[in-house]
Amino acid sequence: MNTSSNLVRGFIGAALVLLTLQRSSLADSATWSSNPTSGDWNTAANWVPNVVPNGTSDTATFGSSSLTDVTNTLIIDLDSLVFEPGAPHYAITTLDNIRLYGNGVVNNSEVTQSFVAGAFFFKNNASAGNMTTYSSVGGFFSFENSASAGSAAFDLSSDSTPAYMFFSDSSTAADATINASAGFDVTFLDSSTGGTATINLSSAALVDVPGSFNAEHITINCIGGNQSLGSAVYLEGFSNAGEGTFTAVGGSTIGEHGGYIQVDNQATADHATFIIGGGLGAGLNSGILVFLQTATAANASITANGGVDGSLGGLVVFADKSKGGKASITLNGNSELDISDRNTGVTIGSLAGQGTIYLGSNTLTIGSNNQSTIFSGVIEENGGVNKSGTGTLTLSGANTYTGTTTVSGGVLNVANKSGSATGSAEVKVNTGTVGGSGIIAGATTIGTGSGTGAFLAPAIGTNKQAALTIQSALTFNSDATYTCTFKAKKNKAKADQVIANGVTINGAAVNLVGQTQGSLKRGLRLTLISNTSANPINGTFNNLPDGGIVTINGNNFQASYKGGDGNDLTLTVVP
């Protein structure tokens, strides 16, 4: 015999009997009296007819009345709580539960109606209403089934006891505004949705999402915290950030944590916007966005902003096996992207801004969303960079990473003025293009020898000639093309140029794209490759033999692989 089970059943049975006896005298729809004896909800004389509405099909109606401060101290079940047209402002305080099963709170008045809540339960299709406010310290709110928070405004905080707002089943936050502070916890369960709600978190308040929640167009702002914990959002389980906007604001006082957003388990950032703030003053903490386990940034737009007066910049972290997907990431000011704790490399859609990237020993692949962006910050540590997709990635900073740079699609535009845009290691252009007027430190190989085509084009994407500097050796394989543009008029000419410390050409091609005006002066010379090595160029382009002549716009140019100071590739105007 299960004694514990029988005791529980006995307790529930006794409670139901007591509740039935209570409701036998407190049940029916009624209207709050225009001249009540007190503000006590639970006094029958205050209602017309003289019964307290307390049943799942009952409606409590509030119209014109001489007393509009109302207090409830019992569990109340209602279909609806209705404010009639012309009703004045009511302030209804419930010290126990009000449970709504039908239409919920319906405000037909033209003024805002206020509730001070112990606990509210919205069930079935019940709504929290429009032009309604709910304030609570240590209270409890539950939206179940297909219930809605309507366009209500909630001002919620926690005292010494836990305080929660739950959305479960397929309920929705709708168009509500929820201000939560002091550790209040807003939780979205099951397949609940965010609608177009706005949630403002402060003083260590939380939004917790462990289920299959869809954020839709929600806005959540994490506004700092305290010295032990910042306000936080946890997107977990199979949750979906939808097209929501999530902001983690940096700390505003010494010791205060910034807002924290965590995308975890199998959650997706989908097409959401994330804004991660830096500290708001000298020495202050930043906001943080972290992707963990197998969560994905998907197609999100992520912007991390710099700190004020030297404070920490916003931080974006990919760890475990989390994925960057096609997310666009912008690092402003001294903000940071850290992938050093990833188990392997990570792919992101695009990269822009001026911040710092920590690779660890991983490879950061950039370009899966095919956008064209400029990054002028610093990429550090032992990992590498892979440019993918069809867009252009411009690197204009002096990067210090020590891993390989690979181009597997699109354009890598090197635009730095000092240091090396591609770190210290080798550069491999397997497919796609490398170009620009910047500096590459490592040995550079164009093509694989069996690929679909790889290009070196200093002037790529511009209308003027450029000189690309490679401080190590340059190799062109058989599937490579050197695209060289030039402009010439009479006795003046300007050509693209690659400057390299040693050159090997293994059957590659050169594509000469020239603009000339009239006949050029005999002896006019263009330098296509400036070889800074003491050794001669090894090999020739398959369509430009040594001594060969090419005709461009009626002008003849003769190639020499021993031109310039004796080991450069030059074109000289000849008859």
Indicate where each model-derived feature is located.
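Extracellular beta-strand/loop-rich repeat segments of large surface/secreted proteins
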Residues: 291, 365-366, 385, 422, ...
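N-terminal extracellular ligand-recognition/capping segment immediately after the signal peptide
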Residues: 36, 64-79, 401, 439-441
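Extracellular repeat-rich scaffold modules on cell surfaces
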Residues: 29-41, 49, 95-202, 210-329, ...
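Extracellular/surface-exposed low-complexity segments
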Residues: 2-60, 251, 332-334, 340-343, ...
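A structural signal for beta-strand register positions
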Residues: 82, 275-278, 303, 392-394, ...
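Glycine-rich repeat segments that build the extracellular carbohydrate-interaction surface of secreted
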Residues: 33, 52-66, 83-84, 413-415, ...
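Extracellular beta-helix/beta-solenoid repeat scaffolds
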Residues: 78-122, 362-367, 452-474, 482, ...
